């Protein structure tokens, strides 16, 4: 019982830490300013003025430290100047958001370090890699039959987010200021997709670090109860469920839900019983797979719909949860199409004077890269049109030749690096062709020439980085003398984020 008590209880580590004073420290916003300047490989360089940004930080700290700016009434709510009306409003709001995120992340970082030390996990950075998910799928999904493709519902009400976060951050002053900032931020800017009920959409592209933290706290709360139910479904009546109900009651959930769970908990667990069940999530998409009948996943489907509605006041349409058979349908996840295929084979067997042939089918976990979404991402980044014909990149034409080539090659290498686990490399060859010709057309545009004349004048050696062996984009040539002989899938443990070109779900 102590094991499950520790699993569900609220973390009491460092409850007395106060984060509120950090909000008024200038170095926090300097750190946030550096984070803003880190752009993805597809974005142009951002020019900025260090002096003006420092003045903005000091002005923001002065405004936040004055109590009268934090008091809002019905009469003066429109005159509140906490966020101001300056020409740097977007940058100012973004920097405040990043500064809040740095402060809030402190508590989560302390909890993570404490958890890793307690569990004696040394190489925790390997667990952060996106590619670490796919070896797990390869090892376990071969024996599963059905999978639920789940889109986690949003938008979420601002107050629900703050209430969820307060179970992890114990500083009430910081949470009050955070609540004030969220409502002001929503009213003053268009960076948050809002609804009349003050709900925000967080999983869309371009959102800020702070809202991703709030969204992850909501996911952590949802998964802490959901995964507990999954883990306990195999124990049935032998496990006491009192701890679960205490936590649900503590969170102020609906009393009727608690009573139903308390009286019918063993029956509920029996309905969800499955010999093998696996759960995987990345961002706003999750997978629930089982080797049982589709009826089991249907039960989980309607349980999740009611769970989100009762606990987070979110209505999730049942159509957002798709149940597919792995042997007949592909799973679109993290830029890959994954499926379980049957490879037929014939085995000749001989016993004494009699011989016969046996048909045997071996399951294989197949992972490929869909070319159409990838071309759509290239078209969005202005490397080609919607049908995949390469075009020039006028925004880069003012740079030097070496800089243009290096930038195209770096994008190509990153795409190959992320999609190194694909069973088929044909689509990657197409991507390399598009980027190589787009690079040539960009250089020709810069020199006011045609592609043919430009390459003929300077020689094909100008693009030799694109003409190297394809596997060299995956394996460094100096890494091993056997790199040419290996043609299988490769998963990397250093990929912790997805850029726009591969985030095409």
From Swiss-Prot:
UniProt keywords, alphabetically: Chloroplast, mRNA processing, Plastid, RNA-binding, tRNA processing
Keyword tRNA processing belongs to the record: yes
Organism: Micranthes integrifolia
Domain of life: Eukaryota
A Pfam family this chain is assigned to: MatK_N
One CC-aspect GO term: chloroplast
Its biological purpose: Usually encoded in the trnK tRNA gene intron. Probably assists in splicing its own and other chloroplast group II introns.
GN (gene name): matK
Family matches, as InterPro entries: Domain_X, Maturase_MatK, Maturase_MatK_N
Entry GO MF terms: RNA binding
GO terms under biological process: mRNA processing; RNA splicing; tRNA processing
Cross-referenced PANTHER family: MATURASE K (PTHR34811:SF1)
Location in the cell: Plastid, Chloroplast
Family: Belongs to the intron maturase 2 family. MatK subfamily.
Protein name from the UniProt record: Maturase K
HAMAP family listed in its UniProt record: MatK (MF_01390)
